[in-house]
Amino acid sequence: MIEINDFKKIEDVPQEVIEKYESVISDKVIEFWKRYGLGTFFDGFMKSINPEEYTDLMGYGTQFYKEAIPLFVTGLGDIIYVEKEDGFMGILKFRYKSTTMLLKNFDYTLDLIIDKEDDELCKEYIEPQMYFEALKTKEAPAYDECFGYVPILSLGGKEVVEHMDTVKIREHILLITELTGPIND
């Protein structure tokens, strides 16, 4: 298991959630949940989430990943998920209306995200740059918040810090999906 030095625990993953997913997802995910719980890391960019609280957004926000299990939300409102069938991980980038496949291995995916020594893959696939740019002038969003573009990018918003506000994650994803439709990748 990868060591996460800046993890800020909010709460434990409910036991019923662990039991529900034990036979469905990687032992590494269960180990992560038991060791760390729900909270933030990677300077607040990554949020470990209860999948039960985001499963409805997966169904509403995309046509093709309804069976995927959401594991993390980023500080930019993207959902990192694991597919039930094959264990591959991916990221739904609501801000761009796109999906990117990541890796099959949970530990490698986490390492890809938090390795500050070799961040090229993270920059290419997770794209956290604007989050860290915003932190230079804005306070980090709370656990249930993220930075969102106002107006949203697909409606002409500009990808600049000046157009980023702190928004509620769920409401922001719902707004993007309501205004522009589900991700069709």
Feature annotation, model-predicted:
Residues 1-91, 96, 141, 145-185:
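A surface-exposed partner-binding patch
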